[in-house]
A protein has these predicted regions:
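Short, solvent-exposed polar/charged micro-motifs at secondary-structure junctions
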Residues: 9-13, 75, 146-147
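Conserved donor NDP-sugar-binding/catalytic core segment of glycosyltransferases
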Residues: 1-17
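Phosphate/oxyanion-binding loops and surfaces in catalytic or ligand/nucleic-acid-binding neighborhoods
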Residues: 8, 43, 86, 90, ...
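C-terminal subregions of glycosyltransferases and related glycan-biosynthesis enzymes
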Residues: 85, 96-216
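Short secondary-structure boundary/hinge segments and terminal tails
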Residues: 9-11, 25, 102, 187
Length: 216
């Protein structure tokens, strides 16, 4: 099980944004495209689930692994997908924003190039587990991942990277536009606002959103 999360900054202040994920009827496609679990802090997992996905690398002599510890990023979605694709366990969320999730400038979430590389490595690693699934779903999931990274670049006020990633996800697949038109449109609008009007203008908008979120 898992819950939504309110986003906070380095100082612990609410940003006005939140992860409000899908809570029910979740399958591997939803996890691959949108990762409704959101972050590892939001999840509560039964021991039996970990027992079902345990593995031991050839060079590990002492203990079982559950997450792939060779990953520095994307280790959470790699684990969730192994659960979804190789076991009968179901994912279901609990209503409400029950955790806070810190977005750190210059942290892992901000390193969009490394995060994209880790995501692609995750896809390559798991492909043999369900080849037909990944062949069918990877293009759309990649577009969603690029859109997410575009939003991270926007939050970091990195106009060139935000614009580059926005072009990339639209070119990869238009399904995010059809499936989530509002979020897709606001992402594109923010990327081009940042590029055309500069970080100061967008920062003012983000500050207003943070103040509004703090009062809700």
């Amino acid at each position: 099980s898992f819950s939504g999360s309110a986003l906070i900054n380095d100082d612990g202040a609410f940003t006005g944004q939140a992860q409000r994920p899908r809570l029910r009827n979740i399958d591997a496609r939803h996890i691959f495209k949108r990762n409704p679990i959101g972050n590892g802090s939001a999840a509560v997992i039964r021991r039996e689930v970990f027992d079902a996905i345990a593995f031991r690398p050839d060079y590990e002599a002492h203990r079982e692994w559950y997450f792939d510890e060779t990953f520095r990023q994307s280790e959470d979605i790699e684990c969730w997908l192994r659960i979804a694709l190789s076991t009968d366990w179901e994912f279901e969320g609990v209503p409400g924003l029950l955790t806070n999730y810190r977005i750190s400038a210059g942290g892992l979430s901000s390193a969009t190039d490394r995060q994209l590389a880790a995501w692609e490595r995750m896809v390559g690693k798991l492909f043999s587990l369900a080849p037909e699934f990944f062949a069918s779903e990877a293009p759309v999931a990649r577009a969603y991942q690029l859109r997410y990274l575009s939003r991270r670049a926007i939050s970091d006020l990195d106009a060139p990277r935000a614009r580059e990633l926005s072009h990339a996800w639209v070119k990869t697949s238009l399904k995010p536009v059809r499936e989530e038109p509002l979020k897709s449109a606001t992402t594109l609008a923010a990327a081009y606002t940042l590029s055309l009007l500069g970080p100061r203008f967008l920062r003012q908008i983000m500050s207003l959103a943070a103040r509004k979120g703090a009062t809700q």
